[in-house]
């Protein structure tokens, strides 16, 4: 672990001959003195119990496509391939694509953490575990993060070009042709309503869910059920 007081002066010294935007410099420094130290603090404060946190009782096995990249979801496929090639992925790919799917699908936190530890060259447990357990999976129930970072396909479409070349249609909310992130997002909120509906940062999402009629709720749950059946039967999803 490189301590902050050594890291930052060295970084600032390298900037003297480089033309780097101020917002990029600020963002990097804030990550070093803020988020990194916060993760380290959570780890030392909450271990070893933190390693077994599973607030949402997520129990779905880690899909094989996390290792093989054999999936029809282009965002997942691309991020896994990048990880295979480089032992690295951007933090948004980790959180809002791979972590987001793990959250929505209810993957077991221990298996997700094991995967992150194995595949990334920069994965040290003190920083990987809080980010995955607390930030990506909300498995600690809000110790680290104030809400689950759950998002539908529309978010991924806005933030990337993955959806343009995907097998699924991101504009379709249901059926086997629709993006799984769309119905899995609402199914996630339905499944975990008892634990999450009082979270103020999810109030708009739950108000939208309440406006949906029973038929819509049933369709969401049906699509999610079919998806999980195919996944658990070894079919390509």
Predicted regions and their residues:
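C-terminal catalytic domain of photolyase/cryptochrome flavoproteins
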Residues: 3-237
